[in-house]
Amino acid sequence: MENLKLITSSRRLMALAALATGVALPPQSIMAASTAQVVQQSGVVKGQVLDPSGEPVIGATVKVKGSKTGTVTDIDGNFSLSAAPGAMVEVSYIGYKTMTVKAGNGPLNVTLEDDNQALSEVVVVGFGTQKKVNLTGAVSVIDSKEIASRPVANATQALQGLVPGLQISSSSGSMDATPNVNVRGTTTIGEGSKGTPLILIDGSEGDLNTINPQDIESVSVLKDAAASSIYGSRAPFGVILVTTKKGKSGKVTVNYNNSFRFSGMIRGKHMMNSVDYAAWVNDAHTNGGSGVFFDQERMDKIVAYHNATPVGPGTRKDANGNLLYGIDSSNGTTWNDGYGFGVDDVDWYDALYKSTAFSQEHNASVSGGNDKFNFYASFNYLHNGGFMKLDKDKNDRYNTAAKIGAQITDWLHLDYSTRWTRTDFQRPATLTNSLYQDLARQGWPVLPLQDRNGYYYSAPSPALGLATAGKDTKERDILNQQVNLLIEPIKNWRTHIDFTYRSENTARHWDKKMLYNHDVAGNPIVYDKGSNVHEDEYKENYYNFQAYTEYNFSLAKKHNFHVMGGFQAEQLRKTEFGLQRDGVLDESRLEVD
């Protein structure tokens, strides 16, 4: 009773605050049961709303169903509502079930019932589950409906903005970069320590970025230090528990959905044109006391080329029909230096980057079952296109998942699941994380992108390397298999036996070809003779076995006990090697034998 009185007092304070500000609390999706009699006097319904302990409910919403006519109860739980005879009256309040009664003859005395549904919701917390009402730690729960409709590339991004205190950030723009996850802000400054939470997928440690977001049934985020009582030193920064979907009793259900997306750069830049750039550089040199960098003759050529109409690579035509070129040759054989003689007008950000990148995703799943057997299977394909213009950059992902559950006997249940993920990543071999900022320093607008023959001009322009130097690829396969046994020989005594095997194979291939300039006649000239092929291999095998038993019982219908004990063992084996061969002999066979 003391607990009930405390709850009533807190609700009364909430209702007083609502009445003081003149704001009516919104009706809630709750039901109530009571005895009701209605007095109809001149179209006015009067009555009182009480809680299960008989205390008045302050601020309960009372309204005529299907209309905007409504009121709230006063400090004594009383109300007066304009309603016609026979009108249906709804009474609702947060934390209680809603009642709908028909206006009759007599006072309306309503006794609400507690809505225990929210408190009975089961949450995955560590080994096993708990009801929300019994939780003492900080836990946030997300269900599949909140995740499925989000157009994201991975499950980590799907959680962004859904969990208070969960911070998700990216430290790199590379397409194979994975987001960083942090639960409680910056928690460590130690070198090599990221302070990331422990991530468990169906009870086994895994990578959140490798699963299909639409395979997720629910996510529980354990935020406080209480998680360390179960997971020890691996969980000081929180735990993210992911439960994937499984089959349900009922007829077979087939789902398919897709999405097509166009992405733009968040802060795409554009360079000033060649005329403005040359003027600014001259002003800077003059202010520094070193005179102008672009003399008058070159300035005139820059202005003329800027005002002319493009008609071909490195070529424009002025109003008089004269052809102008972004770079010339002084000796008739090789092109002049771009910094010293170039008069082109190139926006390097526009030349190297697309304005939009295309992505597409396809999802298909099938599920069904009965009381004895259920199944779930899914397939996902995700293509993420990059922003590079001169060569392909992409990151593709393939996901397949299957899960079956079988009630073998009355006391034995078996679950088996398998999940396979492949990611294919590709980018130009000379693409670096600093390219975008390097363009601001090295990408002068007067530097030519191409000569008049259509060949890419040499460095310091990055175009030649991006278009012709080779590619960097990475292929990653992850296979995850789990077997779960649930043994319940007597009621409320359950024993869980789980085994997980995960294998990962990653192969990276990086080749660097020789770079060729071209002379005025279009003949190739070796610019960079450095060439090599690099191969990396990474293999990982992970084994996890855990067994725990739990027993629930109650005394005097008031004292609930949950006893649990268990054991866990895991093993991780890694193999990693890399090699590189310099001096490519045959560019048609870029491989290491």
Regions found by a protein language model. Give the residues of each.
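Short secondary-structure capping/turn segments at boundaries of alpha-helices and beta-strands
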Residues: G77, N363-A364, Q482-N484, S503, ...
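Catalytic cores of large soluble enzymes that bind and process phosphate-bearing ligands
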Residues: I147, P151, M175, K354, ...
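Short, Lys/Arg-rich amphipathic segments at extreme N-termini
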Residues: L50, A463-L464, I487
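Short, small/polar-rich motifs associated with maturation and membrane association
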Residues: M1-A401, H413-D415
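Surface-exposed loop/interface segments of Gram-negative outer-membrane beta-barrel transport/assembly proteins
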Residues: S249-D344, L382, G386-N480, H496-D498, ...
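Residue-level signature of outer-membrane beta-barrel architecture
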Residues: T244-K246, G368-N370, A406-Q407, L485-I487, ...
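Active-site and adjacent substrate-binding regions of carbohydrate-active enzymes
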Residues: N492
